[in-house]
Amino acid sequence: MTPQSQFLVLAPVTPGRERDLRALLATMNSAPGMADPANAVLAFGQFERLHFARLAVLDDPTLSDEAYDLPRQSLPVYLALTGSCDGPADECISDLARRAGTGLRRIFAHCDGFDAGGDLAAWMQAHRGRLAANYINWVGRTVRQVKEEGALHRALAAKVSRALLASGAQAQELRRELIDFVDTEVSAGRLGLTPPDPTPVGWWIAKLLHLLWIPLVGLVLLPFLIVLSPLLIYLLRAKEESDAEICPPQDRAALLELQRLEDHDVSNQYTAIGSVKPGLFRRWLVSGLLVAVNYTARHVFTRGFLARVQTIHFAFWAFLDDKRRLVFTSNYDGGHEAYMDDFINKVAWGLNLSFSHGVGWPRTRWLVARGARIESKFKNYQRRHQLPTEVWYKAYPGLALADLKRNQRIREGLEPVRVTDAEAEAWLRLL
């Protein structure tokens, strides 16, 4: 099994160069916000292990929100390059620098402190943002597997009649014929069914250590948390009662720009940024909660679900500016409105845990109640904090997670030597 990883390369944009940068990024697209896989600047399609990638200018439109009687923050505009890949992120970044160095230098030339003649891979590694929490829908599912199983489905579907089968025996016979067909196509090189690579030993060791280490730290801290719980509860409720709500509707022009970049595929992108509420209490609380989110995403939600949500391919949270801001990105199936409704209806409490520490979030009660459940305020809030994703790449356009799961089941259905009539019929229905 090849594990997946994600990365964030982050650099401040040189003042006065943002407009030129956006113009360059626009030349990389074949549709609004949708990267041409073979574009002349950064041909994402040549990287066989890259699932998703994006380039986004993180220009926070909510920095001017006034709350807590604090002066307005003056923070940099960043350029973010993100990627979701097979194998270690370090290797993917090095591969990008080696094979697409010319285009990346053109892009990063708009950033402060970039040396066009220096070691690009080292510069990108030095500008990596640390991910606070990281979600992967199906650990071990590679780009190669997705593409091979997609081709398998198309080849088999073209061979199968849509007419109903008369009997289980007929289903068994058709299944055997299709297995013979696949064997012939694989032998001829027209289909590929590459077996998974061995899982790296280092990955298993790191996963086991993380599995044990985080609970041990929690056990050490537990007595202190119990002693301090009255104070912590008081602080939480006092802040929840007094925190400012800033949830006006999104500016219409900005909303139309976001919508212009959406629904060009069965999947969409989401990039959002916001300021963390001031004070050590909120900073420590959100840091601890994201450790918990990362732990469950790494050890519990690894097979198609994030809590009850099944439509997210990859997502991550990352702090910026010494934890004064938080950026969130995701790649999800379906439309934006359905995506938000899915979260509200299934895991509004999870939204509150992760995001209620942002300035202006709808007021929560006991950390998990209210907040995102107040639908109109939540939807206004998240749209105001969403940023245009200037360039977005998906390695397998037209395929949603439901398709990937179906195609995987089709491949797995080739393996058993004997199946029941009902199993043969169920497998054929997948085609």
Name these PLM-found stretches.
Residues 35-41, 86-121, 198, 204, ...:
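An amphipathic, aromatic/His-enriched active-site/gating alpha helix that lines ligand/cofactor pockets
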Residues 51-68, 73-98, 102-106, 306, ...:
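Elongated alpha-helical scaffolds
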Residues 1-51, 59-62, 72-78, 84-87, ...:
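Short S/T/G/P-rich N-terminal loop/turn motif that feeds into the first structured element of a domain
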